[in-house]
């Protein structure tokens, strides 16, 4: 996989947004992408930028509401192919440990 995206789809509201965020993530299932959600965003991997943008568009459209904000950052690796997890593994190799704290 060569295209990575960091996606954040947020309905603008004072209410809880868990259901809406879940709808955006569920929409990714209909696309040829892999993804991992964290508390701040969802990292998406796709073979092409077109695949990534189609998935992002579906996630955005899946969120109900009158005011939706979507933030997308794209890393388009055209010179080599590797998974996003490899980026984290390289940092962890340099650290000699997992790239996270032991605190809870």
Residue positions per predicted region:
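Charge-rich, low-complexity N-terminal segments
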Residues: 1-104
């Amino acid at each position: 996989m060569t295209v990575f995206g960091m996606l954040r789809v947020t309905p603008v509201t004072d209410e809880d947004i868990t259901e809406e965020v879940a709808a955006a993530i569920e929409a990714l299932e209909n696309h040829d992408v892999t993804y991992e959600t964290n508390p701040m965003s969802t990292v998406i991997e796709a073979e092409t930028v077109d695949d990534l943008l189609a998935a992002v568009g579906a996630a955005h459209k899946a969120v109900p509401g009158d005011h939706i904000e979507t933030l997308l950052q794209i890393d388009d690796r055209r010179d080599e192919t590797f998974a996003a997890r490899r980026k984290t593994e390289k940092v962890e190799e340099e650290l000699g440990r997992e790239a996270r704290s032991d605190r809870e």
